[in-house]
């Protein structure tokens, strides 16, 4: 059969598939770190070497290390590292060059040790050590340069004084069809009796195989020159049908007992079997027949990448652990995440296992499950524990190791400790946790330790287990029920006596390999359930504080050590809470400063035992012999009004009646949940029938509350009424009612609350809407002075007198209105003759109008007016002055007939003006002004016939801007009238001119005669008194004298 192209070696796949808890009792401070040559992959494999009970050291594989072998490059090595920390030295398993044969007269190598990855696996069993080179190549055909990775192993015994090579797949007929790509030593383990198990996953077109052999057979009669060697008791699994090609059986191996015959079986991982789902086989060690398989749950998860055996639940039966580091977790519809899994199969009896317990990794690409090791009983609790490697998890992919503790039902699902890699590598991840080995005690403290390899960083780390201390602590309170009236203790420096009680702290310890004396650091917290800043009801007698730190020295195991502390109760006026228990809490920890030895690891408290103890004291209350108050709380409430109208200043008072028909209710409070529409305004204080409570506004979980104190306690038989006032204004999103929730709450344990009262107050909307209007002028008097009709008028004055109708829609309230329709019917013509010719429509406020037909169809020129005084006056409720111009000669009263003919939309043609009115709040208006001209010619043709022109306006409110609507929405209508009447002029007489002249002349003659008669009678002469005559004469005489 022709050879297929050899795949990339499987060893590289195992190493590079993913290229790019809190602490418990593995000590992360006192580490032993071994380092190897850079780039050697030191730490790729590790194990403990215990040739005798008194000697423990560490073996570390470095598969890319250089050795002293001539002409061999990076052949790989195994290092022996002493403990305590000592320098590591290479173990000289093989110091030779490649063996050669003569081909056509030339000596050519028959084996190839360069890059053979010696040290990729290493295992020790007592004084025996086996290390393998799975990429060791062998030249099968002497006349062909081709070579095959058959793999080889070396055995060291007698403290590395004797060595033997073991290459079970090296033969003269090696090829892919056979064992040419075997890679023997890819995995490695020992039976308990010391026999060797070797995995060769590349045999038979990568079907894989497992091989077992006795170390004694390998050593006996070994000769370096004996290249092709067959052992008498060697066992190998054979070739399977072609459907098993590329399965990789032997990728991992382990040994355990599963058939109940006390004879161990071997376990082999087959990560690409079962159509790439992977499986693990239990194989009979006697004849290597297959007994049972466990199959993976997900394709390509690499189920079987690693296997381990441990009695996790300590039932005497071995259990199987399987790693699937490429398992991908799918969460809902999110992208799958590669997190890895570990499966635990608990053995219940021979051939019978439970369904697997599954541990799932948490970090993407962390490769959780790449390594699994049995740790032994790490914390000495009677159950074995395991470690799981996630070599590419953590910060910068430095790697993690997770410790899982066993218990009676398997493994605890959360790790008790997570070890983090401390090294980062620029070229590749450090691989911390890629290989693990446990279940050996290097420091002889009776606790097993752990080795972790970090081949990318060239490190191997030994973690030592810390002794576990289990503390049994308790608190004793005397008395547990404190009588606040029994004041027998006087604190230092205080003249007052207080009630007090004793807190006794007792503790004992035990543990494996613990010193005779340990010291606990303790902290006592009084009333620990009270939040920070709250009043602590009890204080230490000597310190007046609610917490105290102290130490307990315990000199030997299992002996109880106690300390007493005196505690007192504050005065009752200093706190409200009398019912809830007084929590006394003890926290403790180990005083590590007490341990002086720098080499020994310090003990640690048991992770699975809470380092705290709690007890509770109670305050004696007046609640009978059982000190348990059981109230019987009742609550009723009514509002002082049944209905709230939107838009009004709604103030509502809740009249509330709390009642207690049982025993005292402590810290009793009335809780009122306020609806969004309401605001708390206060307590009613002016009604003597209502008790005045102390109330506060609060926010509880974003809920607005009013909380009122009802007493501490609210005594038995309490029954009263109180009034709480609210202002209700915010109705934007209100439904048909608002709801207040009321309840009494207390701190009593039983019957702590009253019935819940839901108080509903109905909400309604109501608005009074008024439409009003005016005509300006109210009447037109014909005929018009100095006006002549024109056949084709172009200016508005040529049509006739101005007529304006003004309409206002006014919301009196209290609620707002929205979406109102306003209609105006306007008498525009009768037959072919115009009546009122519309020039312009003007609006004010949230009003949008349109007409049923065009206006000003004759394109009459007009000036667009601003708000006229009469419109402004109308809108602001002022008196509208009508200035009616009368004809100068028309001074008589208008001529009226008994009745005027009414012209409206019932008998003439009208234009319909439709308006949509927006939201009008209380007291707001919208107005419409129609500016028109009376078509005078139409009426002058009907001389002396009076008319009344009537426009009709109506409105209807469609809805209000609230969720709640009134039963009937406002609507109404009115008519605005303009009268057209005729004047009747007074009769006038013409006087001739000569009559006027004659009348003037006669008048002047009469005036002259009258004047002459009066003069003749002395009417114009002035009579003087005698004294005045004398004075005048004296004055005259004096003047004359002076002149002289």
Curated annotation (Swiss-Prot):
Example GO molecular function: metal ion binding
Disulfide bond annotation, renumbered to this chain: 81-88, 132-153, 169-182, 489-500, 506-562, 623-629, 695-708, 849-905, 910-915
Signal peptide: 1-23
GO cellular component: external side of plasma membrane; integrin complex
Subcellular location: Membrane; Cell membrane
UniProt binding sites for Ca(2+) 3: 377, 379, 381, 383, 385
Expressing tissues: Prominently expressed on axons and on cells in contact with basal laminae in embryos.
Segments annotated as FG-GAP repeats: 28-90, 104-165, 170-222, 236-288, 289-354, 355-413, 417-480
SUPFAM superfamilies attached to this UniProt entry: Integrin alpha N-terminal domain (SSF69318), Integrin domains (SSF69179)
Transmembrane portions of the chain: 992-1015
Membrane topology, from the record: Single-pass type I membrane protein
Residues binding Ca(2+) 4, per UniProt: 441, 443, 445, 447, 449
List of residues binding Ca(2+) 1: 257, 259, 261, 265
Cytoplasmic topological domain residue ranges: 1016-1044
Sugar-bearing residue positions: 66, 104, 159, 221, 284, 293, 486, 587, 701, 719, 751, 762, 818, 877, 904, 952, 986
Recorded superkingdom: Eukaryota
Subunit and partners: Heterodimer of an alpha and a beta subunit. The alpha subunit is composed of a heavy and a light chain linked by a disulfide bond. Alpha-8 associates with beta-1.
Name under which the protein is recorded: Integrin alpha-8
Gene that produces this protein: ITGA8
């Amino acid at each position: 059969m022709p050879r297929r192209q050899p795949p990339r070696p499987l060893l590289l796949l195992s190493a590079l598939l993913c290229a790019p808890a809190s602490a418990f009792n593995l000590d992360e401070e006192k580490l032993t770190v071994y380092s190897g040559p850079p780039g050697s992959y030191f730490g790729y494999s590790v194990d403990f070497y215990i040739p005798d009970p008194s000697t423990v050291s560490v073996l570390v594989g470095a598969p890319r290390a250089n050795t002293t072998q001539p002409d061999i490059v990076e052949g790989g090595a195994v290092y022996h590292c002493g403990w305590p920390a000592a320098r590591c030295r290479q173990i000289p398993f093989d110091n030779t060059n490649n063996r050669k044969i003569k081909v056509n007269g030339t000596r050519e190598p028959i084996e190839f040790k360069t890059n053979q990855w010696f040290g990729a696996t290493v295992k020790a069993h007592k004084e025996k050590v086996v290390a393998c080179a799975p990429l060791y190549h062998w030249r099968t055909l002497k006349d062909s340069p081709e070579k095959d990775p058959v793999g080889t192993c070396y055995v060291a015994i007698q403290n590395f004084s004797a060595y033997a090579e073991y290459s079970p797949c090296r033969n003269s007929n090696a090829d892919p069809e056979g064992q040419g790509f075997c890679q023997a030593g890819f995995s490695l383990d020992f039976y308990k009796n010391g026999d060797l198990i070797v995995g060769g996953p590349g045999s038979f077109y990568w079907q894989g195989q497992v091989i077992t052999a006795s170390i004694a057979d390998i050593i006996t009669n070994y000769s370096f020159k004996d290249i092709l060697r067959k052992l008498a008791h060697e066992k190998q699994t054979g070739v399977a049908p072609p459907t098993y090609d590329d399965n990789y059986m032997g990728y991992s191996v382990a040994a355990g007992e599963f058939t109940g015959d006390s004879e161990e079986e071997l376990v082999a991982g087959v990560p690409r079997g079962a159509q790439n789902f992977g499986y693990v086989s239990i194989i009979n060690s006697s004849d290597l027949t297959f007994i049972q398989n466990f199959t993976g749950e997900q394709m390509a998860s690499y189920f079987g990448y690693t296997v381990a055996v441990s009695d996790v639940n300590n039932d005497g039966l071995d259990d199987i652990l399987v790693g699937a580091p490429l398992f991908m977790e799918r969460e809902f519809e999110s992208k799958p995440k590669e997190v890895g899994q570990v499966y635990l199969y608990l053995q219940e009896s021979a051939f019978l296992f439970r369904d697997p317990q599954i541990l799932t990794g948490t970090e993407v690409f962390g490769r959780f499950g790449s390594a699994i090791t049995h740790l032994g009983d790490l914390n000495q609790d009677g159950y074995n524990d395991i470690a799981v490697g996630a070599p590419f998890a953590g910060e910068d992919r430095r790697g993690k190791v997770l410790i899982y503790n066993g218990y009676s039902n398997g493994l605890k699902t959360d790790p008790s400790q997570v070890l983090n890699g401390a090294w980062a590598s620029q070229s590749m991840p450090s691989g911390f946790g890629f290989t693990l080995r446990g279940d050996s005690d290097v420091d002889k403290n009776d606790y097993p330790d752990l080795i972790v390899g970090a081949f990318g960083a060239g490190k191997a780390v030994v973690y030592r287990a810390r002794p576990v201390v289990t503390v049994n602590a308790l608190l004793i309170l005397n008395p547990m029920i404190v009588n606040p009236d029994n004041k027998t203790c006087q604190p230092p420096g205080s003249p007052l006596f207080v009630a007090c009680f004793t807190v006794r702290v007792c503790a004992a310890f035990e543990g494996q390999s613990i010193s005779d004396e340990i010291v606990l650091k303790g902290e006592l917290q009084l009333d620990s359930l009270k939040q920070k800043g709250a009043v602590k009801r009890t204080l230490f007698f000597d310190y007046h504080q609610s917490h105290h730190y102290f130490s307990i020295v315990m000199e030997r195991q299992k002996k109880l050590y106690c300390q007493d502390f005196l505690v007192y109760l504050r005065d009752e006026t200093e706190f409200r809470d009398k019912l809830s228990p007084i929590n006394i809490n003890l926290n403790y920890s180990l005083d590590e400063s007490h341990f002086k030895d720098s080499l020994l690891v310090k003990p640690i408290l048991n992770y699975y035992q809470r380092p705290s103890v709690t007890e509770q004291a109670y305050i004696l209350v007046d609640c009978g012999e059982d000190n348990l108050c059981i109230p019987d709380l009742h609550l009723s409430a009514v509002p002082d009004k049944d209905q709230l109208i939107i838009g009004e200043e709604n103030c509502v008072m809740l009249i509330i009646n709390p009642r207690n028909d049982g025993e005292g209710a402590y810290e009793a409070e009335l809780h009122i949940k306020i609806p969004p529409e309401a605001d708390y305004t206060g307590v009613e204080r002016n009604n003597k029938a209502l008790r005045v409570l102390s109330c506060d506004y609060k926010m509880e979980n974003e809920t607005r509350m009013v909380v009122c104190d009802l007493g501490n306690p609210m005594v038995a038989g309490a029954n009263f009424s109180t009034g709480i006032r609210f202002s209700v204004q915010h109705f934007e999103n209100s439904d048909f009612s608002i709801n207040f929730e009321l309840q009494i709450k207390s701190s009593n344990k039983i019957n702590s609350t009253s019935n819940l009262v839901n108080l509903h107050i109905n909400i309604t909307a109501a608005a009074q809407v008024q439409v009003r209007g005016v005509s300006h002028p109210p009447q037109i008097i014909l005929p018009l002075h100095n006006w002549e009709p024109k056949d084709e008028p172009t200016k508005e004055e040529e049509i006739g007198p101005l007529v304006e109708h003004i309409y206002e829609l006014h919301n009196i309230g209290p609620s707002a209105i929205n979406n109102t329709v306003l209609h105006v019917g306007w008498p525009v013509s009768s037959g072919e003759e115009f009546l009122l010719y519309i020039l312009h429509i003007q609006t004010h406020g949230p009003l949008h109008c349109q007409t049923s037909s065009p206006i000003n169809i004759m394109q009459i020129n007009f000036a667009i007016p601003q708000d006229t005084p009469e419109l402004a006056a109308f809108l602001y409720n002022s008196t509208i002055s009508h200035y009616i111009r009368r004809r100068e000669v028309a001074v008589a009263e208008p001529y009226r007939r008994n009745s005027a003919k009414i012209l409206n939309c019932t008998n003439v043609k009208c234009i319909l003006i439709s308006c949509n009115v927006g939201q009008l709040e209380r007291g707001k208006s919208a107005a419409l002004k129609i500016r028109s001209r009376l078509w005078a010619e139409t009426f002058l043709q009907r001389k002396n016939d009076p008319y009344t022109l009537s426009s009709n306006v109506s409105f209807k409110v469609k809805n209000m801007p609230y969720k709640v609507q009134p039963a009937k929405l406002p609507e109404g209508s009115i008519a605005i009238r303009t009268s057209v009447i005729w004047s009747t002029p007074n009769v006038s007489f013409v006087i001739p001119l000569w009559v006027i002249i004659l009348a003037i002349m006669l008048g002047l003659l009469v005036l002259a005669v009258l004047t002459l008669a009066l003069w003749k009678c002395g009417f114009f002469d002035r009579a003087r008194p005698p004294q005045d005559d004398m004075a005048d004469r004296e004055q005259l005489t004096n003047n004359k004298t002076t002149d002289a």
